[in-house]
Amino acid sequence: MDAHAATLLRVSLAVVFIWFGILKPLGYSVANELVERTVYWFDPGWFIPFLGWWEVLIGVTLLVRPWIRVAVLLLLLQMPGTFLPLVLLPDVCWVRAPWAPSLEGQYIIKNLVLISAAIAVGGTVRPDIRRGRDLPARPPANV
């Protein structure tokens, strides 16, 4: 399982970002109204498609191993904004703050998993640094 975990996590993240991202410029994302109400200072006519294509770019860069660092950077720049509705739209995001999020609030809070997964995937870029150059990747089987 360990041999494929990072690849599966990376591809899964890519699928989510490409899929959910492309829905925004096409006008099919259930999050479009939430985005529009949250960042009301931007014209949604250009901002929602821009955000969608940004997410697609995150997904595509996750699929190309040498670009993983770019993907993580793009994701970390984008993700803080996804939490804004929890503060700016409490009537939409909470049934009873801070313990009972609405469906929209749950949709936002699950982004913690996406951030953590991206950090885990980013950690696979240079495993020799994480483990030390002279250490074996795994302990011997008889230990």
Regions found by a protein language model. Name each.
Residues M1-V143:
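Membrane-interface extramembranous regions
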